[in-house]
């Protein structure tokens, strides 16, 4: 990280504003900085042992007012008025409820009007704000970086440390700029941008870095789109992803329940406007992407970096020069039951999942509804549409989107992480293939033996209608009903 009197990147500014005690030493021997944490998000999976640690040490939660909890990973998305059937999931949810009650932490339980995926409720409540440090025991905490916050996932022992001290010892990260300039072609979205970025730099390309996404294409994105991009930073190996706040950010936050009001709002915005990378600041790494060259993207393998444009065929491992890459591709194709050279558009799916902290927001649901309106989900396809929060669900209902989903033959569910991960009832059966708007396509991620293709909401909707991986352009010649 840069010293204060030099031009600084956005990440360096936020970092330096939160140093409680600076580490001493140089290079690898340098001690960590002690960083103050502004917002701590908690869910049922990674928190039980952390609370047990507090209990054993006789410690309280230092700042319960800066801590918020929700139930998202393990909760069902149907019959939410009934007890959770799976005993492990039920125990984790019940344990979170007891811990929050004991330690005085706000909790939005299943069915609550503000319940939802942790990375969706933070922004929608206005808790996530520019210049903050945000942590959660979840990989995709980088979502909140869309607001110009330094947000990162942490482990259970670190969760306990933050609960006890509201601080975290961290070593400074390297910085990377991902510049995306130009105009996106029609039908190309934020999800396609980030899938293309990961395919370009690889799943380890951002290791040890905070990525700042910059350029005209990024600035043109809505906050929902920016959250999608930052959400998947971890899939490129990065510690966090950030986008400088601007008028789009401020308008999204204005009037949110926990956003500043009145004179405090004006003062906050004045500070937030300074949260930009200085002219002349140096990044450790920098890459450039021409947005006008992008097209709908889809993964073919078992990590998010194994992706290609939808118009391409399945890659041939024999054409890969790197031996490790070739072996990984061969293993992935075997698991995915795909043959090299098969056009991506000819790959049939059994299931389509729309949701997750990547693409479970109202903008995503509107895109899907626009495509499904007047059309039917293919007879051989099961489609789940799962809102990222109860507030998103209520908004979708008020706009008539739920009726469009059900009329098309999709299942319109309650809020939760759902099929993003195999920790709740929404799972793939062995051998089932899914086009998913989520963020990970690892082996077994959506259920043991399940096969996942990561796609944008638009591609997911078109795929549901046609039954094979498709883009909205493929539907143009097909009539609606």
From Swiss-Prot:
A Pfam match: Aconitase
Annotated binding of [4Fe-4S] cluster, by residue: 357, 417, 420
Record SUPFAM superfamilies: Aconitase iron-sulfur domain
Binding note for cofactor: Binds 1 [4Fe-4S] cluster per subunit.
Pathway recorded for this protein: Amino-acid biosynthesis; L-leucine biosynthesis; L-leucine from 3-methyl-2-oxobutanoate: step 2/4
Family membership noted in the UniProt record: Belongs to the aconitase/IPM isomerase family. LeuC type 1 subfamily.
High-level lineage: Bacteria, Bacillati, Actinomycetota, Actinomycetes, Mycobacteriales
Catalytic activity, reaction form: (2R,3S)-3-isopropylmalate = (2S)-2-isopropylmalate
Domain of life: Bacteria
GO biological process terms, semicolon-separated: L-leucine biosynthetic process
Biological role: Catalyzes the isomerization between 2-isopropylmalate and 3-isopropylmalate, via the formation of 2-isopropylmaleate.
E.C. number: 4.2.1.33
Organism: Mycolicibacterium vanbaalenii (strain DSM 7251 / JCM 13017 / BCRC 16820 / KCTC 9966 / NRRL B-24157 / PYR-1)
An MF annotation (GO) of this entry: 4 iron, 4 sulfur cluster binding
Cofactor: [4Fe-4S] cluster
Quaternary structure annotation from Swiss-Prot or TrEMBL: Heterodimer of LeuC and LeuD.
Record keywords: 4Fe-4S, Amino-acid biosynthesis, Branched-chain amino acid biosynthesis, Iron, Iron-sulfur, Leucine biosynthesis, Lyase, Metal-binding
Family matches, as InterPro entries: 3-IsopropMal_deHydase_lsu, Acnase/IPM_dHydase_lsu_aba_1/3, Acoase/IPM_deHydtase_lsu_aba, Aconitase_4Fe-4S_BS, Aconitase_4Fe-4S_dom, IPM_dehydratase_rel_enz, IPMI_cat
Protein name: 3-isopropylmalate dehydratase large subunit
Disulfide topology: none
């Amino acid at each position: 990280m840069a010293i204060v009197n030099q031009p600084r990147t956005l990440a360096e500014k936020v970092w330096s504003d939160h140093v409680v005690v600076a580490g001493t030493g140089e290079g690898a021997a340098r001690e960590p900085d002690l960083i103050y944490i502004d917002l701590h998000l908690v869910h049922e999976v990674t928190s039980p042992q952390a609370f047990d640690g507090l209990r054993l040490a006789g410690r309280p939660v230092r700042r319960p007012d800066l801590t918020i909890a929700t139930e998202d990973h393990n909760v069902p998305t149907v019959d939410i008025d009934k007890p959770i059937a799976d005993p492990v999931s039920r125990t984790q949810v019940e344990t979170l409820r007891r811990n929050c009650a004991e330690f005085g932490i706000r909790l939005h339980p299943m069915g609550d009007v503000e319940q939802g995926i942790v990375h969706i409720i933070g922004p929608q409540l206005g808790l996530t704000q520019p210049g903050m440090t945000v942590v959660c025991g979840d990989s995709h905490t980088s979502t909140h970086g869309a607001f110009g916050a330094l947000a990162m996932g942490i482990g259970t022992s670190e969760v306990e440390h933050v609960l006890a001290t509201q601080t975290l010892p961290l070593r400074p990260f390297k910085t990377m700029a991902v510049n995306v300039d130009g105009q996106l072609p029609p039908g190309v979205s934020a999800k396609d941008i980030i899938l293309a970025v990961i395919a370009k730099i690889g799943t380890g390309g951002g290791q040890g870095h905070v990525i700042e996404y910059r350029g005209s294409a990024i600035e043109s994105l809505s906050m929902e789109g920016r959250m999608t991009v930052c959400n998947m930073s971890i899939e490129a190996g990065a510690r966090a992803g950030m986008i400088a706040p601007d008028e789009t950010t401020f308008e999204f936050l204005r009037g949110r329940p926990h956003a500043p009001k009145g004179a405090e709002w004006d003062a906050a915005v004045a500070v937030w406007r300074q949260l930009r990378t200085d002219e002349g600041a140096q990044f450790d790494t920098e890459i450039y992407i021409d947005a006008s060259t992008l097209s709908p993207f889809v993964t073919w393998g078992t990590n998010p970096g194994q992706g290609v444009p939808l118009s391409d065929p399945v890659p041939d491992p024999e054409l890969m020069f790197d031996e490790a890459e070739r072996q990984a591709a061969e293993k992935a194709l075997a698991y995915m039951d795909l043959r090299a050279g098969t056009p991506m558009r000819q790959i049939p799916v059994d299931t389509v999942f729309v949701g997750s902290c990547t693409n479970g927001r109202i903008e995503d649901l509107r895109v899907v509804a626009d495509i499904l309106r007047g059309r039917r989900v293919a007879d051989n396809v099961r489609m789940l549409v799962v809102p990222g929060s109860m507030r998103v669900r209520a908004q979708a209902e008020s706009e008539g989107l739920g009726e469009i989903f059900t009329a098309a033959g999709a299942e319109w569910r309650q809020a939760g992480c759902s099929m993003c991960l195999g920790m709740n009832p929404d799972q793939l059966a062995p051998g089932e293939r899914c086009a998913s708007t989520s963020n990970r396509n690892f082996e077994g991620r959506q259920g043991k033996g399940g096969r996942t293709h990561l796609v944008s909401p638009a591609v997911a909707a078109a795929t549901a209608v046609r039954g094979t991986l498709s883009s909205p352009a493929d539907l143009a010649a097909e009539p609606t009903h």
